[in-house]
Amino acid sequence: MERPRFVDHPDPNAVLRGGPLNGGRTRVHNWVPVDFHVGDETCFYRPTGELDAQYPTLNVYVFDHAEPV
């Protein structure tokens, strides 16, 4: 499974937790749920409003669900 190119962003402000993109760092422009196409699924992540323990300057987005494409 290939990670979307915008995961592991060079200037991230959010980290993805759970699901197939766990640990990926990305940049979001609005604090709203985001989706990523991964293989034959669309994975949805939602913001928690919390900072990450591993990356304390990044906001946490948690895996919500996946839907087939």
Per-segment meaning from a language model:
Residues 1-69:
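Domain-length accessory/inserted modules outside core catalytic folds
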